[in-house]
């Protein structure tokens, strides 16, 4: 199975990114430097990591590029790479920037060569030029078909679309070829992203284009990790600007699935807009702010320890006690938040689900436990410093 960035890993990167950008969509070199340097890599290595991750060469890192940089660093630290790789692995290339990577490889002579497949003599009259780009109108139609045929797990089987196949001018062999192309694991069902790609291939074949025989490496990795990012801000080819005509191939393409959707009563399907259900909640933002506060407290403690080390035998500094009080106050505050949530005193947004409240409770519990553990560790360290100071005094 191809490597991938797990959802938990992406969430960790998001917490770091959002805490540094303060609401901005980009991370500057100055903002990223402290995070990257904490890895312990040499400056020349970090420079090469930055060059790899900054795919669009704008001098900043957006969130996708920041994820790339962090994953490359962790792979080096974990021994996956002996040094910074000269090029990004295909599975790590952000789908929205794949065309930039391909263009750069072409200019530098490192273009990836895909297998060339000769024209199929059994398919005379078909056209070349299949395009993986989905126009917004096509994508909306694909999503409508998906919504009507998905199972309770959000997946679609090959047989669920039998009625659609009958309405298309596509041979059964080509339909199965398209299914196998987007289902490399040969599973009985495919998820939403793979289903959209499957319908897109059938759409092109319905218009008279050949079924693609191979998939670009970066896109193939996206199929394998069941996550595809379809960007609709790409410049469309000139043929999309022509007026639809039922007698032209473009007109036939526009009619893909219309008859099928009409039978389902979904001919006037409209998208409802972007789904922001996965947006960051207040508790998640609070977790980000808390982590930032803990980092600041750690820095204060490190400063106190350094002062104590320099002063060995001198007057005991009062800062450790102050830091301890700050940690205790922060811990008490989080415990109070937890009690309020459990008693139903917090003001949540209307319509919140029980699972969302349970997730918030679990997050606060984890924060509280982490703070308690951190406080105990700091107290032990503080006691050790005090013993060292007392030993120094006694030794004089």
Swiss-Prot record:
UniProt KW keywords: Actin-binding, Calcium, Cell membrane, Coiled coil, Cytoplasm, Cytoskeleton, Endocytosis, Endosome, Membrane, Metal-binding, Repeat
Domain EH per the UniProt entry, residue ranges: 9-99, 138-226
Primary location: membrane
Membrane topology: Peripheral membrane protein
Quaternary organization: Component of the PAN1 actin cytoskeleton-regulatory complex.
Name of the protein in question: Actin cytoskeleton-regulatory complex protein END3
Region annotation (Disordered) ranges: 341-396
Family (UniProt): Belongs to the END3 family.
Lineage: Eukaryota, Fungi, Dikarya, Ascomycota, Pezizomycotina
GO terms, molecular function: actin binding; calcium ion binding
Compartment annotation: Cell membrane; Endosome membrane; Cytoplasm, Cytoskeleton, Actin patch
Function: Component of the PAN1 actin cytoskeleton-regulatory complex required for the internalization of endosomes during actin-coupled endocytosis. The complex links the site of endocytosis to the cell membrane-associated actin cytoskeleton. Mediates uptake of external molecules and vacuolar degradation of plasma membrane proteins. Plays a role in the proper organization of the cell membrane-associated actin cytoskeleton and promotes its destabilization.
GO biological process: actin filament organization; endocytosis; endosomal transport
SUPFAM superfamilies hit by this protein: EF-hand (SSF47473)
Residues of the EF-hand domain: 41-76
InterPro entries noted in UniProt: EF-hand-dom_pair, EF_Hand_1_Ca_BS, EF_hand_dom, EH_dom, End3
């Amino acid at each position: 199975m191809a490597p991938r960035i797990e959802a938990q890993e992406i969430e960790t990167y998001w917490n770091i990114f959002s805490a540094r950008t303060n609401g901005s969509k980009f991370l500057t070199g100055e903002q990223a430097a402290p995070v990257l340097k904490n890895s312990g890599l040499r400056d020349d290595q970090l420079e090469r990591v930055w060059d790899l991750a900054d795919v669009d060469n704008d001098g900043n890192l957006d969130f996708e590029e920041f994820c790339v940089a962090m994953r490359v660093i962790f792979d080096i630290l974990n021994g996956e790479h002996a040094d910074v790789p000269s090029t990004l692995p295909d599975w790590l290339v952000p789908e929205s920037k794949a065309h930039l990577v391909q263009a750069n490889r072409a200019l530098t002579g490192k273009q990836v060569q895909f297998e060339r497949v000769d024209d199929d003599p059994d398919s005379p009259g078909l056209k070349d030029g299949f395009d993986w780009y989905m126009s917004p109108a096509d994508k909306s139609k694909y999503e409508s078909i998906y919504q009507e045929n998905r199972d309770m797990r959000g997946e679609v089987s090959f047989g669920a679309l039998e009625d659609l196949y009958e309405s298309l001018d596509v041979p059964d062999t080509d339909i199965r070829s398209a299914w196998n192309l987007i289902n490399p694991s040969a599973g009985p069902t495919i998820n939403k992203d793979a289903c959209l790609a499957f319908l897109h291939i059938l759409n092109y074949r319905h218009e008279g284009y050949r079924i693609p025989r191979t998939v670009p490496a970066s896109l193939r990795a996206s199929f394998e990790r069941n996550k595809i990012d379809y960007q609709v801000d790409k410049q469309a080819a000139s043929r999309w600007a022509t007026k639809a005509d039922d007698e032209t191939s473009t007109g036939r393409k526009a009619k893909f699935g219309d008859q099928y959707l009409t039978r389902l009563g979904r001919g006037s399907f409209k998208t409802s807009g972007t789904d922001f259900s996965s947006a960051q909640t207040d508790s998640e933002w609070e977790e980000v702010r808390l982590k930032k506060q803990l980092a600041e407290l750690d820095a204060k403690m490190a400063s106190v320890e350094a002062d104590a080390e320099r002063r060995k035998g001198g007057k005991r500094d009062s800062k450790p006690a102050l830091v301890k009080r700050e940690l205790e106050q922060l811990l008490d505050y989080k415990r109070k938040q937890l009690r309020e949530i459990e008693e139903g005193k917090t003001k949540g947004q209307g319509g919140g689900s029980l699972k969302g409240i349970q997730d918030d409770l679990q997050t606060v519990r984890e924060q509280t436990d982490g703070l308690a553990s951190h406080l105990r560790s700091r107290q032990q360290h503080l006691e050790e410093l005090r013993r060292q100071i007392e030993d120094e005094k006694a030794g004089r």
